[in-house]
Design a protein with these regions (language model features):
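Trp- and S/T/G-rich repeat-edge/linker motifs of beta-rich repeat architectures
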Residues: 106-109, 113-128
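Feature primarily recognizes SF3-like P-loop helicase cores of small DNA viruses
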Residues: 2-102, 127-452
């Protein structure tokens, strides 16, 4: 034992002789008492804050000789100090610059995740002092911002927050939530180690996936990898999934989307189409979501820029500019799925953009029967099915999503449709027999083939 530890050891005879042993024991008992009485739920936290507020007012009241009592109210600084006694809070950031433009996040005792909800912070503050004004509430938030330390988001690939805990892919065990893990969101489906695939009047999810894949093993794998990436965005696959059909309807495309939404749960997915990624106000609504899903993108849309889309897909830092609020830095940690009846056009024709895409075609048309309607309305909402899907998804660790032949061919067509020069080179130059062609002639031929 080091000299320092020995000097502080309450069992040391010298320490006992000085009467410090009792002091150390008292401090240890206080520490254990605080741990035992610390709030375990948000309801308990609110009750504790109310008690602390009452205690502050009682300790600071002024009693006069005539029996009158004057009650003082805690200042914003005092309220912030009380909040800081109980909250695990900070700013999720990677460096000082992100700290300057970050948001105060706090550990939600009920969900096991960190939230950046100003409304919840203000509600907690009013548990201490109900008479706080809007200006004082803003002042309290500012004190919390100034006192915040840096929080590092947990991006460990094998730790996945689900509804009933944190699943460890290394140990295959469920761990309890803890403030030491900084997660912004979780999957709202329980992990059930005993989950098996249910059957609903003869319908099974695995057989449906086989129909979608049409016998293509790579496509079947991509379907399951998509679910795995939705469940665990920390895999950082750097790609987005495009679900495509030809617009005939009843292809199962929207049913697959609803399955993903049911799996992550209400409040954990956001609606954002391709064009809307470049809209500051709409992008702000997508923060804190596990899944960003865009339904029925218009194939006639022309996307002039895709910078935000690429940054979100790769988890890069973005300046978020919410309407009426202070701009802040944010790193998205989610998965993108987009649905469409045809591929929209892009002004960006670089490989940097197109290698972010994986395309899954839904070309099987289902009959409009009551039995098929139950698949979307009932079966894919069943918790037994969702727990089976989650269990299977957690057994997968795809660092790279399968690049199917189907996807490669469609991406090639997209590039040609979006890049007129590439289309010309691919379809017209091979027909030329001469190795020496005048530039003027070549340019006029290009204009003619492009219907200018």
């Amino acid at each position: 034992m080091s000299r320092k530890r020995q000097a502080l050891d309450p069992n040391n005879p010298t320490v006992r002789g000085l009467g410090l042993g009792a002091l150390f024991n008292d401090l240890e008992n206080q520490r254990r008492s605080r741990q035992a009485t610390s709030p375990k739920t948000m309801k308990e936290l609110k009750a504790q804050l109310q008690r602390d507020g009452e205690q502050w007012r009682d300790e600071h009241k002024k009693e006069f000789k005539n029996g009158n009592v004057k009650i003082f109210h805690p200042s914003p600084r005092s309220v912030a100090d009380i909040l800081e006694k109980y909250l695990y809070y900070g700013i999720i950031a990677n460096d000082d610059e992100e700290m300057e433009r970050g948001q105060v996040s706090f550990y939600d005792l009920d969900s096991g995740t960190y939230k950046a909800s100003q409304r919840t912070l203000e509600k907690l503050a009013t548990c201490i002092e109900r008479s706080l004004t809007t200006r004082q509430l803003a002042e309290i938030r500012h004190y919390l911002f100034l006192d915040s330390h840096r929080l590092t988001e947990t991006r460990t690939k094998w730790l996945i927050p689900v509804n009933n805990g944190i699943y460890n892919q290394h140990t295959h065990k469920l761990e309890p939530f803890s403030s030491k893990y900084v997660f912004r969101h979780k999957i709202m489906t329980n992990y059930n180690a005993n989950a098996t695939e249910p059957s609903f009047n003869g319908w099974q999810l695995s057989e449906w996936f086989q129909q979608i894949a049409g016998g293509d093993r790579d496509k079947l794998l991509l379907l399951w990898q998509t679910i795995s990436a939705v469940v665990n965005p920390n895999l950082t696959t750097d790609v987005a999934i495009f679900l495509v059909d030809n617009g005939q309807g009843r292809t199962g495309k929207s049913t697959f989307e609803r399955l993903l939404e049911n799996l992550v749960g209400a409040g954990n997915y956001g609606s954002l189409k391709l064009k809307e990624f470049e809209d500051d106000f709409k992008l702000a609504s997508a923060t804190g979501k596990a899944l960003l899903i865009g339904d029925d993108n218009n194939p006639n849309d022309y996307n002039r820029t895709s910078e935000n889309f690429k940054s979100v897909a790769t988890g890069e830092n973005i300046l978020i500019n919410p309407k009426g609020l202070t701009p802040f830095n944010y790193r998205f940690n989610n998965f993108i799925v987009q649905s469409m009846n045809g591929i929209p056009r892009f002004s960006d024709t670089s490989d940097v953009l197109f290698r972010r895409f994986r395309v899954i075609v839904f070309d099987h048309q289902y009959k409009a029967t009551a039995a098929n309607k139950r698949i979307k309305d009932e079966y894919i909402k069943d918790q037994r099915l969702l727990e089976f899907v989650l269990k299977k998804a957690l057994s997968m660790t795809p660092d790279v999503l399968q690049d199917t032949t189907e996807s490669q061919e469609i991406i090639k067509d997209i590039k040609e449709d979006n890049d007129s020069v590439d289309h010309f080179i691919e379809n017209y130059l091979p027909e030329m027999e001469s190795t020496r062609v005048p530039i003027t002639f070549l340019f006029k031929l290009f204009l003619a083939t492009m219907d200018y």
